[in-house]
Amino acid sequence: MRVILLGAPGAGKGTQAKFITEKFGIPQISTGDMLRAAVKAGTELGLKAKSVMDAGNLVSDDLIIGLIKDRLAEPDCANGVLFDGFPRTIPQAEALLKAGLEIDHVLEIAVDDEEIVKRMSGRRVHEGSGRIYHTIFNPPKVEGVDDVTGESLVQRKDDVEETVRLRLKVYHDQTKPLVEFYSKLEAQNGKPKCSHIPGVGSVEEITAKVLVALS
């Protein structure tokens, strides 16, 4: 079972990805991890990727597809994989298709932009311990202060509203069109099975919907 999990930053993909990999016993593969592993191992593709990155350039989709093919040939991928952060664009999805790498399921965790902005921009972190609070959903006892140490909480750069909205725009421009791309494929070929899962509610409720979609 090969699964692509789509959703905007802050939609809760990480939680559901953990559930899918544990429930179905499949690895989560990310292009970043594959690149680092190939470079470290000094494989032919790894050396090519290293020379591209050392020159300050982006690694081509063809090279990434080569890495994915190598990774899928490993024993732990025999029952399937969960793709993490790939494909991000239509050309990457087309490259997967051209390479004959079939996808069984495409899940979109859908959350309204304003809900995501509320979720992410309300996060506050205690840098020393990594404890995470939220101004609405999990506030500290005293505003802006860590419950344990009494030290100040900070807002990470990634959680600033302006940054969140920028990341959402990139998602809508580049990655959201994949939902339509795969829906058309499903209409034509009966595969992959595309599922739209509302990402609002308790973790258990969303997980139950994910399980139904993959069954």
Curated annotation (Swiss-Prot):
Pathway info: Purine metabolism; AMP biosynthesis via salvage pathway; AMP from ADP: step 1/1
- MF (Gene Ontology): adenylate kinase activity; ATP binding
UniProtKB keywords? ATP-binding, Cytoplasm, Kinase, Nucleotide biosynthesis, Nucleotide-binding, Transferase
Q: What class of enzyme is it?
A: transferase
UniProt: ATP binding residues: 10-15, 123, 132-133, 201
Q: What does this protein do?
A: Catalyzes the reversible transfer of the terminal phosphate group between ATP and AMP. Plays an important role in cellular energy homeostasis and in adenine nucleotide metabolism.
Oligomeric form and interacting partners: Monomer.
* This protein's name: Adenylate kinase
What's the source species for this entry?
Answer: Pseudomonas syringae pv. tomato (strain ATCC BAA-871 / DC3000)
Its taxonomic placement starts with: Bacteria, Pseudomonadati, Pseudomonadota, Gammaproteobacteria, Pseudomonadales
